[in-house]
Swiss-Prot record:
NCBIfam families according to UniProt: alaS
Stretches of the chain forming a coiled coil according to its record: none
Membrane among keywords: no
Species of the source: Haemophilus influenzae (strain PittGG)
Family: Belongs to the class-II aminoacyl-tRNA synthetase family.
Official protein name in the record: Alanine--tRNA ligase
SUPFAM superfamilies: Class II aaRS and biotin synthetases, Putative anticodon-binding domain of alanyl-tRNA synthetase (AlaRS), ThrRS/AlaRS common domain, Translation proteins
Catalytic activity reported: tRNA(Ala) + L-alanine + ATP = L-alanyl-tRNA(Ala) + AMP + diphosphate
Listed Pfam families: DHHA1, tRNA-synt_2c, tRNA_SAD
Length: 874
């Protein structure tokens, strides 16, 4: 019996023998296609080839493409674990013809691979095929050449409500390449329910589609007209997991060798015994998508691809919790995954350390809120009477406890409860509105300015140009002229001003002509034109007028130093921390640089020092900063780094600094690394799970920062009557002395508290024979209150003590209950009741509990509530 790895390799070997180029699986993050969330089909990496926008040195290709369908239009997440064949991650085996062979060869290749004893050797009588209703050519090839009986060939027409909307007609979009397809089905036998495709029972599991062969032979125009393509092509896809299930004689994808091994390992780690539990299937599926997404550069976050990854991880963690996992388990599956994926696991293996760290950190982070969130959800579900969970509750779980909506839906599904998603969406929209209102300032020109044409950029070599005004915008509207005092956007035919992009801020400066000055505060791109945003301080400007465009050269120079330093920093991070480091965001201004990057754990002081030292070494090396224009494939062949998800043109600008750094970049840079002068890191911290941020300064700004630090050190040394060299020792002495005094003071407070205890015993009131002390004591910290409560419990023998203290505008609450009363009076219950009055929360043991609060004005009310509650319950 063939393993899944052997089937994958045999497919590639077969098509290689038929003259196909074996092409590596592309990344799960689509390159040059920001419209696509994840790679979800084998043809994604060849999309531009099919559209005629890209040429390859081969006309036949074959791949084993990794795919993810979670989030976006293609989303299988909610079905994973509940069906035999849904996955977030799967491999698509495919063969492609770019104007080479067509229907006859495509069909014969598929049949030979499936049925030949040399390859898969499937019984011919087990295979059924479908064709598009009017595709007589494909029908005849199947029937007359291949020999499939007419009763096992099914014509499928337009079954989706409009012309050419059919299971057997494929289209790339509303317009563009399209064509009929033929699908091959495997019959598992009459012991399994289901009917052939096109029948009322087609949704059963007896007849399973294993291969789809698409014939791209038309170009659909906007009016619906179908034109024949001059060079028709072929795009095919066969799910590796499905064909493995057929060849391994199982009816569920989760019973093939890869999943059996992952399920067994998961059960071993979490201590599960029922290997058919759906939670094991969920986890086995999710480790594949999560590991490969991280290996391809996706980091868990709260937006975009990162949020889909976070949703999948959290769903897996929740199912581990259902199985009884008591500690982090998910990351422990990575070594087994690498093993079962064989050759296809090499990309995860190359980044194994980073994959495991990120999975562990994300799981640990979610574990902190999982229990509390599930408790809230359980309570809410117990009160559901109409089978619908409130959207407000679902949003609170999302907003406060980090529960993605599909995770909450997963829990609800197990209890046959649905979610009011409209209410959830309203809450989400309200939050977005609040966030937008909080962040809005000035005019959002991007939302109102639409300009055709293209601005010629001259800023790589010039800081001053003569230019003609092609458009003016005032208050977001196109105008013919502007007057002094008006803020506006000026569009020029050509410009030396750099428009904000790639993290680099837009240039500032001014536009001038005789008697006219327009102060440019920022430069932004609107499509292909550059907008100069600012204020006309004197004179008037009109469309068609010529002006001198003059960039603030000093600001531009400082910005260029920071941009070049950012490239050196990126290279240094990868050299010292590892190749898992990739850019996740940047801001390059004239004053400083900020760089966000993938890094699963904190950076040590020693590593930070190494990074800074390495960057400064490369600055002193005084490398020339070289720029070259080349096609993107040549750039990547040279090792140039490109950002995931960025769309690049046919030609790209490659920036090289010696043998240390090579990146794609369109920004402004220093001429030599030595121009940077000095690089100094000023902060380093985490900004999200798995993402760190470094802020740094360069050149004169770095020198100024160091001078300021020296000034602070000198002033501090003077205050402590020390010198800079012995300052740390002097501070340590002061800290030791302070700790000693604080300890002595605490002892005095505790002694005073115990001495005051006898006075409280005398003032205790009796409620149904039980001694109760409920008092406000200001200026006493929690630790002293606890000592006092313990002492009073001993003195009373039997009783309840509730103290509230205001210290530094915060409320401290402590409740003590003697052991003989804890059966009916719980300290935690009482302290929480008091905490609600002062805007806080707390907890503890039945005999001792503490809480804090932020509303000292309500302390008297908290004491009264405690007294009333005790009157009622004692």
């Amino acid at each position: 019996m063939k393993t899944t790895a052997e089937i994958r390799q045999s497919f590639l070997d077969f098509f290689h023998s038929k003259g196909h180029q074996v092409v590596e699986s592309s990344s799960l993050v689509p390159e040059n296609d920001p419209t696509l969330l994840f790679t979800n089909a084998g043809m994604n990496q060849f999309k531009d080839v099919f559209l005629g926008m890209d040429k390859r040195p081969y006309s036949r290709a074959t791949t084993a493409q990794r795919c993810v369908r979670a989030g976006g239009k293609h989303n299988d997440l909610e079905n994973v674990g509940y069906t035999a064949r849904h996955h977030t991650f799967f491999e698509m085996l495919g063969n492609f013809s770019f104007g080479d062979y067509f229907k006859q060869d495509a069909i014969n290749f598929a049949w030979e691979y499936l049925t030949s004893p040399q390859w898969l050797g499937l019984p011919k009588e087990k295979l059924w095929v479908t064709v598009y209703e009017t595709d007589d050519e494909a029908y005849n090839i199947w029937n007359k050449e291949v020999g499939v009986p007419a009763e096992r060939i099914i014509r499928i027409g337009d079954n989706k409500g409009s012309p050419y909307a059919s299971d057997n007609f494929w289209a790339m979009g509303d317009t563009g390449p399209c064509g009929p397809c033929t699908e091959i089905f495997y019959d598992h036998g009459d012991h399994i329910w289901g009917g052939p495709p096109g029948s009322p029972e087609e949704d059963g599991d007896r007849y399973i589609e294993i291969w789809n062969v698409v014939f791209m032979q038309f170009n659909r125009l906007a009016d619906g007209t179908m034109e024949k393509l001059p060079r028709p092509s072929v795009d095919t896809g066969m799910g590796l997991e499905r064909i493995s299930a057929v060849l391994q004689h199982v009816n569920s994808n989760y019973e093939i060798d890869i999943f059996k091994t992952l399920i067994a390992k998961t059960a071993e780690i979490v201590g599960a015994t029922d290997l058919t539990n759906k939670s094991l299937r969920v986890i086995a599926d999710h480790i594949r998508s999560c590991a490969y997404l991280i290996a391809d550069g996706v980091i868990p976050s709260n937006e975009g691809r990162g949020y889909v990854l976070r949703r999948i991880i959290r769903r897996a963690v929740r199912h581990g919790h259902l199985l009884g996992a008591k500690e982090s388990f998910f990351y422990k599956l990575v070594p087994t995954l690498i093993e079962v994926m064989a050759e296809a696991g090499k990309d995860v293996k190359a980044k194994q350390t980073n994959v495991e760290k990120l999975l562990r950190l994300e799981e640990e982070q979610f574990a902190r809120t999982l229990e509390r969130g599930l408790s809230l959800l359980d309570e809410a579900l117990s009160q559901v009477k109409d089978g619908i969970l409130s959207g407000e509750v679902a949003f609170k779980l999302y907003d406060t406890y980090g529960f993605p909506l599909d995770l909450t839906a997963d829990v609800c599904r197990e209890r046959n409860i649905t979610i009011d998603e409209q209410a959830f969406d309203r809450e989400m929209e309200a939050q977005r509105t609040r966030a937008q209102a909080a962040s809005q300032f000035g005019v959002d020109y991007n939302s109102v300015i639409r300009v055709d044409g293209e601005t010629k950029f001259e800023g790589y070599t010039e800081v001053e140009s003569q230019a003609k005004i092609t458009a003016l915008f005032y208050d977001g509207k196109s105008v013919e002229s502007i007057e002094a005092g008006q803020s506006a956007v000026v569009i020029l035919e050509n410009t030396p001003f750099y428009a904000e992009s790639g993290g680099q801020i837009g240039d500032s400066g001014y536009l001038s002509t005789q008697g006219v000055t327009f102060n440019v505060k920022d430069t932004q791109k609107y499509g292909q034109v550059f907008g100069h945003i600012g204020e006309l301080t004197q004179g008037s400007l009109k469309v068609g007028q010529s002006v001198n465009a003059i960039v603030d050269a000093k600001r531009r120079h400082n910005t260029s130093l920071n941009h070049s330093a950012t490239h050196l920093l990126h290279a240094a991070l990868r050299q010292i921390l590892g190749l898992h480091v990739v850019q996740k965001g940047s801001l390059v201004s004239d004053k400083a640089l900020r760089f966000d990057f993938a890094q699963p754990e904190a950076i040590t002081k020693e590593q930070l020092s190494e990074i800074e030292t390495l960057v400064n070494q490369k600055i002193r090396a005084n490398f020339p900063v070289q720029t070259d224009i080349m096609d993107i494939d040549s750039a990547k062949a040279k090792g140039a780094m490109a950002l995931f998800g960025e769309k690049y043109g046919d030609k790209v600008r490659v920036l090289t600094m010696g043998d240390f750094s090579i990146e794609l970049c369109g920004g402004i840079h220093a001429k030599r690394t030595g121009d940077i002068g000095l690089f100094k890191i000023i902060t380093e911290n985490a900004v999200a799970a798995g993402i760190r941020r470094i802020e740094a300064v360069t050149g004169q700004n770095a020198i100024d920062w160091l001078h300021n630090q020296q000034r602070i050190l000198t002033q501090s040394a003077d205050l402590l009557k020390s010198d800079v060299n012995t300052l740390a020792e002097k501070i340590q002495q002061l800290q030791d002395k302070t700790k000693k005094v604080e300890k002595e003071l605490q002892g005095l407070k505790e002694k005073a508290a115990m001495q005051a205890g006898s006075d409280f015993v005398k003032s205790a009131v009796k409620i149904n024979g039980v001694s109760v002390i409920a008092q406000q004591l200001d200026g006493i910290e929690t630790k002293s209150l606890r000592v006092m409560v313990d002492d009073l419990k001993n003195q009373l023998g039997s009783g309840v003590i509730a103290f509230a203290s205001i210290l530094d505008k915060k409320v401290n609450l402590v409740v003590g209950v003697t052991n003989d009363l804890t059966a009916k009076i719980k300290a935690g219950e009482l302290v929480n009741l008091m905490a609600q009055q002062v805007g806080g929360k707390g907890g503890g043991r039945p005999d001792m509990a503490m809480a804090g609060g932020s509303q000292p004005e309500n302390v008297a009310q908290a004491i009264k509530v405690a007294q009333d509650w005790l009157n009622k319950n004692l």
